[in-house]
Amino acid sequence: MATIAFHLLSAVGLRIGENHKRSLGSPSRRLSVSVTAFSSDQWRFPDHEQRSAKSFWDYLDAARDFIRPEHNSPSRWFSPLETKAPCHGSPLLLFLPGIDGNGLGLIRQHQKLGQMFDIWCLHIPPSNRSTFTDLVEMVETTVQSENQRSPGKPIYLVGESLGACIALAVAACNPQIDLVLILSNPATSFGNSSLQHLAPLVKVLPDQLDLAFPSVLSLIPGGPIKRMIAHWVRGLPENETAANIYQDLVTTSSFTSILADTFRRETLLWKLMLLDAAALFANAHLHLVQAQTLILSSGNDQILPSTCEGKRLRKKLPKCEVRSFKDNGHCLFLEDGIDLVSIIKATSFYRRGSHQDYISDYIPPTISEFNKCYGVNRLLEVIMGPVFLSTTEDGKMVRGLGGIPSEGPVLLVGNHMLLASDKISLPGQFVHERNINLRPLVHPMMFTRLKDGLLPDVSVYDTLRMMGSVPISATHLHNLLSAKSHILLFPGGIREALHRKGEEYKLMWPEKAEFVRAAAKFGAKIVPFCGVGEDDFLRVVVDYNDQIKVPIVKEVLKSVTAEGPVVR
């Protein structure tokens, strides 16, 4: 039987880490996604990563066709052409725009999102004077209709600023419908922003004063100076940097008239009144929202106090998580480096059915996502210097993971080293060396909290979730084995990772190893492994037994323990 040994040469500084338009009529195609191992010798880029990425200026170019002179033209749904056909069984995603209203806020995300969702975008023409109630009723009608058509699937509402308020209102009025809300910089904070004082100022200014261009420029992510700095940091040649900045300036100037048409004086006044009504309604009905919610807050939002608002909504909504982006501005989805698909995958917010299925709903990371996940741990890898040894079927010990079976189901069972640093190294090494997507079974506290407290936020575990970690349970082990996955199991759990003085290399496994029976049921290969080295370099100075002797620390430990779910 194949075995694997895992050595840490050194370990220093470790830490724990028409109002109803159908989508395009092309035949549906299935996106083939492996949940165990990739078939090729090299990790392939998905189709959507091979295409050139769209920029903010593509957004402006597309906006030209969405600005019409018609008086009070109706709001409507449209499906982006570049999304083509989603994979089989994909849920519906309704994008609800911000104050611009054109519905193109996800243009930089369309290609990747189109692989996972059936995307509809709401377009609110500049001349449209629908009230907030009208917009809520329109979205509500669509949600109810699609829920009747596909009752077993969730409906995603992705909204920014104004659209986030619409999404909250629809969720509050329809608690019986399975909705997933992804809200970027919600305008529920309008009452605490400087925007509320803008309407009286606009009313008293002369008609000849054109406010459109400076107002819209404040919404544009990454002005010329910021973009120039970004180009310099990336190490572009000076002449190329100058060319990029010149193109930015020329493009901005060319679209002045388009931006002005979007935010005429009367339109701006209407939008401000709309935001005021939206914030009042949404805030008054927050207690009715039961939908699963993800708040995306920009730390550099110059329009709304989004950071504080994200924290407030986290306390108000029962099923809410928050992700913060401290260096980004108001138009989050249009900024460089923001990938909504990666955010959804890392937060485990993607599902095709009424409940989260960590096997069928899981989509492995792309090569760029993998590099981003493990880039932050590269220094730790260098410091630890892990060495992997495995035994082939003929009993020969080889360096690397050559002895690990390629075909699943395979169950790797081993010991936790101090602070569970092994959970960082093992999945990455399997990808680098064998192109195998290892599925670790981890403590449920990495996915949920029973209450807020001293434990680190679940966002610190986004990397592990992106790489395929699954909350440990008998059901999940059964499903992973049936899917022929490569599974990583530490029977000793967190108790073994936080072992006490004198417990170096001591196994703390349960008396009944139920995983053996489960593996036998599916004919899985059990690969035992051991991790050694870390306990030879680190010593536990103060352990749990010492800490509980201090009354204050004892109470803190009890409080922390109560925050997370109990496994056994």
Task: Give, region by region, the residue ranges found by the protein language model.
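N-terminal chloroplast transit peptides
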Residues: 1-30, 35-37
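Catalytic active-site module of serine/aspartate enzymes centered on a nucleophile-bearing elbow/loop
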Residues: 2, 7-12, 44, 48-72, ...
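Active-site loop/oxyanion-hole signature of alpha/beta-hydrolase fold enzymes
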Residues: 10, 107, 117-158, 172
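Conserved HGGG/HGGXW glycine-rich cap/lid loop of the alpha/beta-hydrolase fold
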Residues: 42, 48, 54-129
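Conserved serine/cysteine hydrolase catalytic core
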Residues: 85-87, 262-315, 321-326
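Acidic catalytic loop of the alpha/beta-hydrolase fold
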Residues: 101, 299-304, 330, 419
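Flexible "cap/lid" loop of the alpha/beta hydrolase fold
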Residues: 172, 176-227
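Catalytic core of membrane glycerolipid acyltransferases/transacylases, capturing the structured
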Residues: 408-477, 482-483, 494-510, 551
